[in-house]
Amino acid sequence: MLKALVSLQMLFGYSRLFIMKLTAAQQKYFAYWLTRSLPSDSLGKLTASLQDAQVDLTPHQIDAALFAFKSPLSKGAILADEVGLGKTIEAGIILSQFWAEHRRHLLIIAPANLRKQWAAELQEKFFLPSRILESKTFNHYIEDGNLNPFNCEEIVICSYQFAKTKAPYLKQTNWDLVVIDEAHRLRNVYKPANKISNTIKNALADRKKILLTATPLQNSILELYGLTTIIDDYAFGDLKSFKMQYNRNLDETDYQNLRRRLAPLCKRTLRRQVLEYVRYTKRIAILQEFFPTKQEQELYDLVSEYLQRPRLYALPNSQRQLMTLILRKLLASSTHAIYGTLCALIEKLEAKLKCQGVEQSDEDLFKYDYEDYESETEEWFDDEEDENEPDEEEMLSPEDIERVKAEIKDLEKFRELAFKIKRNSKAEQLFEGLNQGFAQLEELGAPKKALIFTESRRTQDFLFDLLEKRGYKGKVVLFNGSNSDKQSTAIYKAWKEKHKGTSKITGSATADKRAALVDYFRDEATIMIATEAAAEGINLQFCSLVVNYDMPWNPQRIEQRIGRCHRYGQNFDVVVINFLNKANAADVRVYELLDQKFQLFSGVFGASDEVLGAIGNGVDFEKRIAQIYQLCRSPKEIKEAFDALQEELQEQISDKMLKARTTLLENFDESVKQKLRSNLAETRDNLNQFEQTLWQLTRSFFADFADFNDNNHSFILHPFFDNGALSWFRRFPGEYMMVSSEHRRTTKLNDGVRPYRIGDPLAQFMLTGLKSVSVPVSEVTLDYSNSPLNVAFIKRLVGQSGWLKVEQLTIDSFEKEDILLHACITDKGETVPSDIAEYMLRLPGSEDPLNVELSETVATALADAITAQRAEITAANAERNNNFFEEEMEKLDNWADDVKAGLEKELRDLDAEIKLRKSESKKTSRLDEKVRVQRLIKDLEKRRSEKRLNLYQAQDDVDSKKEELLSKVEAMLAQKIEQTKLITFHWRII
């Protein structure tokens, strides 16, 4: 890279290379200015990451990201914004900052069904590479010789269950940052029996972590304790001392004390706080009811009765509950879906008879039709401490063989009935639902687009054929896990041809196919039929109609479905169509729960944090519903079971916990709103200056090799001639556009146009090269008269000349910080303030060979000015570090006090028990009872004596631990200082 730059210098010289009114010195200066590291308490710290990302600026997200960097001694943060406020974006900004600082061992632990969404968001919004690790890919890397697939230069994404299984690998990896999504799953980590939570916590001890959760507190204050220990074991004392202080009826003082101690760890923003920045659209629900035909009802009853049998040879005991749930989903989806699965069950039983004792894969049962089987299996067991082992295949007895044959006959009967049913009642109602939905969209002024969700590939194929035949020919597109049908293949081929030679093509066939189908849906099709698994991670804000053709029982999955369209950036209200079998009492009650209790389908925000938090990942809720379908046969039993479930849900949504969460975590006063406003204004100013500097520098550097359009900040970079060192440049030709942060929502890049950003390889090449070049001392003319700058001090310098010198000071203590030191002096000996020198460097400049010498007197004056600035800055840095140290000291003091208080309470409890036993002894008249109680008292007194002896030792141990921690912090406190000379030139202002 450097050779290429040097070759350019030799070919054209500075006068030709550095044009567009920026001198060589200015170019080098701005390269350092754009890439400097800022301190954690600076609003400008995230400027480069924000410019690099394709996200709209919202103040609460910037505030949350800055909170995570608030102290260099912090071990992480809990970001607990309400649902819908973009915690993923907040984490993305933080990850971008780590990536930019070349701290790239990054891990995301998320629910299995959110992994693809994370990967897509990182790529689309932040240009960050990632890899999803699960069993197959992990084993593939191992086979290829990678001994630890977690150790890589990509962001690793995995599920909770996988993280638990591979804990030894996690522990070996030196993570720079770990992001844990839906972190409330770990809130019971304080319970030793909670193996998943404790395994993950122990594997990631001492790593910096960001926890994302909308519900950090649901059932008990102890959950907050659990989450804080994942971040920092020294935020509070041990569990005993925490219970003693906070696990009781708290008064206002207790709440304020706990709030103060949580404040450095937890950040929460409410939706009502950001309404002036974030526009929310509503959800409008349409319920499409239907009644099954006599044949459909007969099939449902027969299969349902079959699933309720005590023993089934077709389903393994270890996974029977999950597989029964899936079969019920397919049964409710369509006769086509259940027909294919019945065929698979028959084949499995026939194979069982032929190959007794041979283990069979149950995944093959659903391999084609139910794509989500693998991730649902993983999620199903995520909350279980020991995943069920697969059943071992045993030899069948003669009686078993006869029973298997009878089961096959029953399944064949069901299959025959399913085959006879050609028309599905629900499918007939689909057209009525679409007509209503499209009419509603027309009224809203929204585009005529519908996203239909089904859980079955066979139902997807059936609906595609049906819609194509009845009014939507050529207007339907499929979206599933393989996307290998003829239509999708043709769409992909045309898309590749259209975008040939552009950055739109990533090289990943899977990702490019998904992009091609989304583009086709946006530009050509009216309807997309998507399966559950495939639709993870795609954003379809251009569509405002969601059709739940099959209704999941898990509210979290429904929320994710609707969230594909009802999300930030949606311009219209979103219509949600649901189908309900009115003949099925259980279906009716499930819909009532989802609609009325969870409020998923209407309103502005969808499901509330309280309700979603009460069900966690939704799997337990789903299991309860599956259990009702399995065990309840009469309408009365169904009603009683659902009434009990609803009552349990109400108990989980505790008013007491809502009050605690409001008091401890929420802050809604005018000062918060004012801070958000001022931070947003300052961030916009920082970004504007950053973008203008990057544009001017790029314009100057590539002046001879590109055509620039200043109106829209775009340029076309021409192919460089293939000439040795310059051949490296050939990677970059094409059209670029730098979209300013304030116009990202309204600006759409044309095909083939690359977004120009600080992290683009072209920009990185330019910056690295400029920082590497030695710039000779020269004569620089700065043109104030023709610049838009209006600075009285500089105006006074017009016609004068002098010297300007810039050095970079790098301080590395608790964190790394780069400061540009400016020394400026006129030829008359007047010192120019450093901030004025900064302004001078932003004036248009031209350069000539040096015609005056730098005298020793002037050189000394410049050096003295630099030294004075250095002293001032190092003192300020030390003061800031001292504040960080004091905060850490206070935290450790509190921790030590907590632990000691817990130990002292044990002694007090023993004193109280001894007193109670003595009172009992006095009251009893029986000698044998007196003897028994006296022996008990003696044992208690012995324990008390031991406790007293141990107490002082334990308190000393706590103090030693505190001293050890402080020594570690103190070692970090020492400033490592490096100073780099950048530029020196003689200036003249005209």
Write out the residue ranges for each language-model feature.
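Hydrophobic positions on the alpha1 helix immediately C-terminal to the Walker A/P-loop
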Residues: 90, 94
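SF2 helicase/translocase NTPase motor core
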Residues: 14-66, 70, 75, 87-89, ...
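Conserved RecA-like P-loop NTPase helicase motor core
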Residues: 159, 473-587
